[in-house]
Amino acid sequence: WVIMLEPTRVDDEIDEDIKNVEDMVSFEAMKAAFCIREDDVIDEAVQNKWNAIQKIFRDRSLQIMPRNLKMVKNYCAVGCRCMERDTPATKFAPLDYALSQKILPTINGNGENYRMLIEDLLKECTAQNMPISAKHLERMKRIAENNMGFYQFFSR
């Protein structure tokens, strides 16, 4: 989704009194809560699932960019600390969010290799264990079937 905002004059905003300033969360508090810490670790099951997903991309000769690898790793480490993961559908929640936000949007191509990539990812990311990613993958598969086999995250 692309959000378009109307331009505003910054001067109009500067003189506004901020209500409830004492209730605002500081940037330092946000960093303490959501930035990776030395003691953050990725749960073994989440790491194994991530390794399996990376292997699917490697087997199809499709690269995941190093920057995205690092973002997924850090997101999963913090997510394993912060997220509730006590049901089968939420056990892999950090990876489910990271995959659907950082990796799946990079899929953009057509042909048998991409069809097999989506099929293999759907086997690994099921509606029971990674519902967000599974939903996106199913949508990509369905749209590609009606779009000459072109697989793209942002297709509608």
Stretch-by-stretch model annotation:
Residues 1-156:
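C-terminal regulatory/interaction module of P-loop NTP-utilizing enzymes
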